[in-house]
Amino acid sequence: ADRPFINEGHPSTLPMFMDYVLRKQYGETSFLVRRASFFGDQIGFHFLRYFGIQWFNTEWIHNTLKIPAGLMSGIAAVIISGLGLVGAWFHNKMNRHSFRYFLSVIILTTVVMVFVMNLSDKEVRDRDYFFVVAYNMWAIWIGIGALALVHLLSSKAGKLALAAILLILPTFNMVSQYKVHDRSKEYIALDYGVNFLNSLEENAIIFTNGDNDTFPLWYAQAVNDPHATQTPVLKGTDVFPTTESSAAIAKAMTYKNKYLKGIRKDITVANLSLLNTPWYIRQLRDHEGVLFGWDDAQLDRLYELRVPSRLDVSAEGANPPMQFSMELDNTPKFRPQEQGYRISDMAVMQIIQENFGKRPIYFAVTCESYIGFEEYTRNEGMVARVTHIPGTDQVNIQRLLHNIDKVYQYRSIEDDDVYKDENMTRLVMNYGSGFVRAAIHYTKMGEYDKALRYVERARHYIDTDIKLTEFYMVFYTATKRWEELDAFIDNTIMTNSLAYQIYPSYVL
């Protein structure tokens, strides 16, 4: 694409292109050092499991026809592997030359692909899309196998009967898989991105964690989707733009208005994972209006950077002053298992230091940490804003209630016709935390009926009561419902595998 909004890897030179092809930004890897057992995990758990779920949805078949899932899996395996092997045999019999070519493609897209991808036993999501060519190749052999069986029968009646059965199989597969793949009413991912963007003040910067809380935002900004609704933009509070920051934002908006067709183009989405790369930092600096003092020479030598012992942050032009400082140890307190700071950690510090007070700055609540700024953030629902006022578990309750009650859309979440996989379920649970915070707030205010209404809304998004522990500890204590408190501790906390962590944190 010409001037893509997000130029992944920015492969504009041969060395950068090779780095992109070799996935250097994800770290060095070796084919010889296996990240998991080749046969047990990479072939068995990953490839064969992915392969199996492409044909007949056993969960749907079990729920609809009451056929045991294990039995259906066995039947499907016999049909799919049997037809494919018959197809391979017939292919070889009819045309050895094309069979050998096809077999080489099958080997490359299965065994060799598994070896090259070297998937770990702790992948963050299913990677079945890596092997889509293998599924298609095997489907061709299945088709040839079906043709072979019809061809081998001598009677016309037998041919017609078998052909009918073989036509029913793909139809049955389509029916069983339809709900899983139907996206006609699925707005969860779109609403996720739109809700994040609409909860931010004008010209905000938001740090996001990974794919799930980044791509939906990019999509909502880049694509003119008629189902994406922009709410009235919240004007910036505690923001004091300078001539430099205003000029940078104006330049960025000229670029973004030209290439983006969606909503909230004023927002800068800064992905923490990509902030480890020089090409992405350049894009934020040059096209997103982010003040960033590292020049190109420094960006080319990122691994020579050293974190300061103290970080001073202040808002230029604020009266009264808005400023705070953080002491930085050699080992990050927010990631004690690692010895040093990541490039992205230093990039976040630099962005906050240079842009604080000039633009609103937020972290998505999905971030694994706030890079040491936890004490200086104030929750507003799905986002936490950086503030100069220190505190523990700070909440802007007015903005939180505004977001969860008036801004966020929750389409598809309670629609049983919309299939939700584990990934979708995890996304949805993030909404629950806002309602829990509202429930705790009203409990502390003595408005117990409101508290119960909000916690009931939280239950729509949170799958187990154990995740409501903080609320029930506060609520039962405030209302002096000691018997219910004891029952919750005995039945919910003490029966949980993490009771040894939860009990000291909330009960003692």
Residue spans for each PLM region:
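ER/secretory pathway lumenal C-terminal domains and tails of membrane proteins involved
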Residues: 1-132, 136-203, 214-508
